[in-house]
């Protein structure tokens, strides 16, 4: 293992179960389901307190049935057929972290159209809403959905472009506001260089206010990425870099909150 890498070990089962359940329920979950998710989150998160630092590790892979809760476009497969990618190839990553912000400050960063104005990770980001932002902000609907075309640069690997589908759901529960974001890539990303693959990416994020000025963030990712000589999402080096990137994202979000942006 390279210096500075942490072991990529399974997280406690209750975190694994919560992330998978949230992924499955984003679309179809009832108000009662959201209450159960929020209750589980507020019960599980304190078992890994802030004093222990971020929790990071592996979890169960998605099943074909869990993959199918989001629409993907068929594509050529390695066996010469056309179909959907096998989710067993998408490596699982889970991160629990906390950052300083209030929910009222944080939520606008999620539905902000020009994400590249907020986060330097993107070279470009063009989002189009596929449901009404006005209805979401007024409370008529509890969710908003979007598609985005984006470009980003991976150091030493090159530039990739992708289409990202996603959405934000807000649930008012007895334990407070629960925000759920879910994103995925319906088609493989396109690279500027050869011998790179990024064809599966499924993400679910849960956010709740833990203290007056702290948000607790639980992220689950299932991703298939092959960077050639740099490694794949089956290597600890690549996976650790990605989990560190999630923690950096929270740090940058806290900075936005401190600056009163967006």
Show where each model-derived region lies.
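Eukaryotic helix-grip
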Residues: 8-262
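C-terminal motif of bacterial Sec signal peptides marking the signal peptidase cleavage site
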Residues: 2-4
């Amino acid at each position: 293992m390279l210096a500075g890498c942490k072991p990529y070990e399974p997280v406690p089962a209750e975190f694994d179960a919560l992330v998978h359940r949230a992924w499955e329920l984003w679309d179809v979950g009832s108000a009662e389901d959201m209450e159960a998710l929020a209750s589980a989150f507020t019960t599980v998160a304190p078992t890994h307190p802030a004093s222990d630092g971020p929790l990071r590790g592996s979890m169960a892979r998605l099943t074909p049935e869990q993959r199918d809760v989001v629409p993907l476009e068929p594509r050529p497969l390695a066996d010469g057929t056309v179909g959907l990618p096998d989710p067993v190839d998408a490596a699982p990553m889970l991160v629990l972290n906390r950052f300083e912000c209030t929910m009222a400050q944080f939520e606008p960063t999620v539905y902000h159209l020009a994400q590249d104005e907020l986060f330097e990770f993107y070279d470009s980001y063009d989002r189009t809403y596929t449901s009404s932002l006005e209805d979401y902000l007024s409370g008529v609907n509890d969710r908003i959905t979007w598609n985005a075309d984006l470009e980003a640069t991976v150091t030493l690997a090159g530039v990739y472009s992708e289409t990202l589908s996603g959405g934000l759901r807000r649930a008012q529960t007895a334990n407070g506001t629960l925000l759920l974001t879910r994103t995925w890539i319906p088609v493989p990303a396109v690279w500027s260089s050869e011998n790179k693959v990024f064809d599966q990416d499924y993400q679910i994020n849960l956010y709740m206010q833990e203290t007056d000025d702290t948000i607790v963030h639980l992220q689950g990712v299932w991703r298939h990425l092959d960077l050639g000589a740099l490694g794949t999402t089956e290597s600890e080096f690549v996976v650790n870099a990605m989990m560190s990137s999630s923690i950096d994202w929270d740090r940058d979000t806290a900075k936005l909150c401190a600056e009163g942006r967006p």
